[in-house]
């Protein structure tokens, strides 16, 4: 494989800078304005959030060994899930009972947005200070040109390395299904008659369940193959999508949310650590750029499938169940990857 070592830019610095800009965008959500202003802020916050994750994910190669990577990645996701519940619960409480304690809904929303922005930065600073980067070379001239050139070479190298390429392809399909279920869950719950409070509580339950479930995956990864655990998680999501065919009651939606929480952290954390183990450490930044493009930019396919099938059949249940195809394709390709040396 053609190797191009990472340009000497500090991942922790860029991750912190991206998080700061993303948090500023989030904190500014409460400022009155029209929908175009809000959309611009939302896009900025989302872009910088995703950029910060590219560098955050690529740090995995520097902070642990291959043997401990599955465990570290899973515990990281677990702590992230339970940690995010704190500002979520406070924000939810403000929105639900704010008027009873003298806050208008706009004031409650303002406090919620600022609280989440501060929380984001507060827990980004420690890793920015303590992280020690191992793999990079001296800074070169024409950094922007070099960066895009290196991204192009990483993509070319990924195509040459069949295992990396096929994993990214498998990941694109099955994670598309995962993120589609996450993104479309509120719309689906609304169609079943859940009010805003019910939807938020269901999402909170998913986060809470994901905490111990991710820790269980961390324990299992020490005893067994991460490939087998990823396959189990993909098949579980396939069953979740198929279950949606007959879903027409609120308690079934809650059961679905619980099942998603059981496997969400596992499939995300083990996919990240598996990818980290098959890429060259020196180019982890560029490769994780490809990884996050496949992940964060994937859910359009599942959303299109749901909309298209729902339009044809007139039944949203069948539309949601259609994304089971994505899990089958992802499983088939990943099964080939797991058999490669």
Model-derived segments and their meaning:
Residues 13-27, 228-243:
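Structural signature of the two symmetry-related core transmembrane helices
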Residues 119-130, 321-341:
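Multi-pass alpha-helical transporter architecture, strongest
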Residues 94-118, 308-327:
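A membrane-interface helix-boundary motif in multi-pass transporters
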Residues 29-42, 245-257:
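Helix-loop junctions at membrane interfaces in 12-TM secondary transporters
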Residues 132-168:
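Juxtamembrane intracellular "pre-TM" segments in multi-pass secondary transporters
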Residues 51-64, 266-279:
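Intracellular juxtamembrane helix-capping segments at the cytosolic ends
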């Amino acid at each position: 494989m053609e190797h191009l070592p990472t340009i000497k830019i500090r991942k922790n610095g860029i991750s912190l800078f991206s998080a700061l800009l993303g948090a500023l965008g989030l904190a500014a959500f409460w400022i009155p304005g029209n929908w175009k202003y809000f959309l611009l802020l939302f896009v900025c916050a989302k872009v910088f959030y995703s950029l910060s994750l590219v560098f955050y994910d690529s740090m995995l190669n520097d902070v642990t060994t291959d043997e401990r990577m599955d465990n570290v990645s899973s515990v990281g996701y677990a702590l992230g899930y339970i940690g995010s519940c704190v500002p979520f619960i406070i924000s939810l409480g403000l929105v639900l009972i704010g008027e009873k304690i003298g806050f208008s809904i706009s004031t409650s929303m303002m406090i919620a947005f600022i609280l989440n922005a501060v929380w984001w930065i507060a827990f980004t600073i420690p890793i920015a200070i303590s992280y020690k980067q191992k793999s990079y070379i001296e800074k070169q001239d024409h950094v922007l040109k070099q960066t895009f050139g290196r991204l192009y070479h990483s993509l070319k190298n990924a195509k040459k390395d069949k295992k990396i390429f096929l994993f990214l392809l498998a990941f694109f399909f099955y994670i598309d299904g995962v993120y589609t279920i996450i993104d479309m869950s509120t719309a689906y719950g609304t169609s079943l008659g859940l009010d805003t409070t019910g939807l938020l509580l269901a999402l909170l339950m998913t986060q809470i369940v994901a905490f111990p479930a991710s820790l269980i995956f961390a324990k299992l990864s020490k005893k067994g193959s991460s490939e087998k655990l990823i396959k189990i998680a993909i098949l579980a999501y396939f069953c979740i999508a198929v279950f949606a065919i007959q879903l027409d009651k609120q308690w079934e939606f809650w059961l679905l949310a619980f099942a998603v929480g059981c496997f969400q952290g596992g499939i995300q954390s083990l996919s990240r650590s598996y990818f980290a183990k098959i890429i060259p450490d020196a180019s982890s930044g560029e490769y994780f750029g490809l990884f996050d493009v496949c992940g964060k930019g994937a859910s359009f396919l599942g959303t299109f499938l749901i909309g298209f099938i729902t339009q044809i059949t007139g039944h949203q249940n069948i539309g949601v169940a259609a994304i089971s195809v994505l899990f089958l394709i992802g499983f088939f390709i990943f099964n080939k990857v797991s058999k490669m040396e």
